[in-house]
């Protein structure tokens, strides 16, 4: 929502809090990352007369204008996330697109047809909620380093790769063909790669750590009937440190259970 695991995926489930139309993929095109803009990098179009930021090849201003033929007025207010942006505090927090920007992005990508306009605001809420959930999972992974440096991690950039199955997702789909009762048989509906800045110590710079997030649909919540999702978040297997962290992340609970420290 790839990591290689010997056990079943351990995925945290997040539940939608309002009615919405479930997208088949994230409608935001994260193929271009904003390394110099605090906004969620929504790719609108490639018109030749569009003014682009040369630092990230993104529009200088994302349209918040009402779309032609639009019937419902949508909010143009943007939500500020809890996710620190860039290398320093003065770069602030990442911002999410407004409902109007979300609709404009979908229309420009040809994904707006069939999406009720009155569902867009709920889609934005879910989009933001999933990103916040992913960040909380990353904070859990980074906690051991945060305790050492006393410096919170930050998000440098992120990109959407909905058409690229992670190795882990591909492996579980293959296992699902052999053991459908045990492993997932449906691919994730989206994938993001996030570049996280891990502190090397106060005033000692940052280390870039790539995280992979596979987003899965989950059975509706039994109590509320609302849609639910599973986020599988983990550091990419780019180096031995990430591989060690992934092994420890899963082996340590098993060790505690074997030692009788954790009961079923």
UniProtKB/Swiss-Prot annotation:
Residues 11-21 have a biased composition (Polar residues). Residues 1-21 are annotated as: Disordered. It catalyses: holo-[cytochrome c] = apo-[cytochrome c] + heme b. The keyword Zinc does not apply. Disulfide bonds: none annotated. The keyword rRNA-binding does not apply. Its EC number is 4.4.1.17. Keywords: Heme, Iron, Lyase, Membrane, Metal-binding, Mitochondrion, Mitochondrion inner membrane, Repeat. GO terms for cellular component: mitochondrial inner membrane. One of its GO terms (molecular function) is metal ion binding. Lyase that probably catalyzes the covalent linking of the heme group to the cytochrome C apoprotein to produce the mature functional cytochrome. This is Holocytochrome-c synthase. It comes from Candida albicans (strain WO-1). The lineage of its organism: Eukaryota, Fungi, Dikarya, Ascomycota, Saccharomycotina.
């Amino acid at each position: 929502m790839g990591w290689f695991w010997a056990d079943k995926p351990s995925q945290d489930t997040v539940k939608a809090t309002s009615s919405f139309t479930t997208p088949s993929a994230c409608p935001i095109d994260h193929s271009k990352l904003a390394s110099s803009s605090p906004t969620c990098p929504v790719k609108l179009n490639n018109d030749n007369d569009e003014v682009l930021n040369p630092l990230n090849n993104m529009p200088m201003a994302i349209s918040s204008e009402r779309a032609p033929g639009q019937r419902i007025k949508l909010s143009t207010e943007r939500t500020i996330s809890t996710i620190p942006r860039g290398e320093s505090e003065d770069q602030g927090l990442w911002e999410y697109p407004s409902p109007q920007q979300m609709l404009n992005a979908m229309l420009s990508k040809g994904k707006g047809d069939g999406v009720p306009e009155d569902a867009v605001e709920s889609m934005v809420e879910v989009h933001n909620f999933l990103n916040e959930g992913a960040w909380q999972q990353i904070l859990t992974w980074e906690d051991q380093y945060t305790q050492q440096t006393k410096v919170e991690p930050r998000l440098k950039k992120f990109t959407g790769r909905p058409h690229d199955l992670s190795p882990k997702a591909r492996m579980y789909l293959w296992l699902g063909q052999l053991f459908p009762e045990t492993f997932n048989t449906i691919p994730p509906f989206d994938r993001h790669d996030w570049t996280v800045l891990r502190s090397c110590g106060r005033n000692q710079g940052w280390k870039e750590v790539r995280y992979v997030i596979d987003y899965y649909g989950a059975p509706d919540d039994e109590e509320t009937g609302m849609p639910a999702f599973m986020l599988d978040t983990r550091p990419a297997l780019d180096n031995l440190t990430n591989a060690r962290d992934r092994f420890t992340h899963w082996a340590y609970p098993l060790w505690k259970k074997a030692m009788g420290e954790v009961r079923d």
